């Protein structure tokens, strides 16, 4: 998978850009092997060999095989986009714009890889568990960012509830689209966030 220009703009310094490219190349080879051999039948050593790195180098970039699937280079882009949104936007509006603007720059290959990784997270038991850990981390990040945006404490229950609701509707889209994750994924996420913004009317 090629890194789109939009995805590497946020990465400062040659060293960091090289690290990002290595992350993506290892992930690309891992996904290829998972398709060919199955997730459970693929070893770290096989991934490292396919990516032309040593196993020790693999572990400098990823702590576990599961982390290869979890890695998402776009996360920092969404965070920076959220921070840059005009103060006149509500937190939910800022989130919607940030997600849309970040993923609009995805290449077709990047979109396909994201869909493939999401399917793996939903279908492989150990990846589901890892996904829950990742979502918990995302909840903490979103809580902190929202609190900073509106000038309230990250311990404020209302702020944490808001962040949890956002994560929850995104999870609902993943499971709704479980059998048919496709180009409509981001559209469905935006629809779900729009419903949340409207108070989840039924």
Model-flagged regions — what are they?
Residues 80-116:
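Hydrophobic alpha-helical connector segments
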Residues 76, 112-140:
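Short secondary-structure transition hinges
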Residues 1-6, 144, 179-202:
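C-terminal peripheral helix-coil segments that are non-catalytic and often amphipathic
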Residues 136-162:
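Hydrophobic alpha-helical bundle segments that form small-molecule/ligand-binding pockets
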């Amino acid at each position: 998978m090629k890194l789109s220009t939009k995805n590497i703009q946020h990465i400062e310094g040659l060293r960091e850009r090289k690290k990002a490219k290595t992350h993506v190349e290892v992930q690309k080879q891992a996904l290829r092997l998972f398709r060919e051999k199955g997730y459970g039948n693929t070893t770290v050593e096989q991934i490292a060999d396919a990516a032309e790195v040593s196993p020790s180098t693999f572990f400098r970039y990823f702590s576990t095989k599961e982390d290869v699937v979890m890695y998402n280079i776009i996360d920092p882009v969404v965070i920076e986009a959220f921070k840059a949104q005009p103060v006149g936007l509500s937190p939910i509006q800022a989130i919607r714009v940030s997600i849309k603007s970040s993923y609009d720059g995805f290449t077709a290959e990047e979109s396909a890889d994201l869909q493939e990784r999401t399917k793996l997270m939903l279908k492989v038991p150990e990846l589901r568990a890892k996904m829950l850990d990742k979502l918990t981390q995302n909840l903490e990040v979103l809580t902190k960012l929202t609190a900073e945006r509106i000038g309230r404490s990250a311990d404020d229950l209302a702020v944490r509830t808001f962040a949890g609701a956002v994560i929850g509707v995104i999870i609902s889209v993943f499971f709704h689209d479980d059998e048919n994750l496709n180009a409509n994924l981001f559209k469905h996420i935006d629809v779900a966030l729009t419903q949340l913004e409207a108070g989840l009317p039924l």
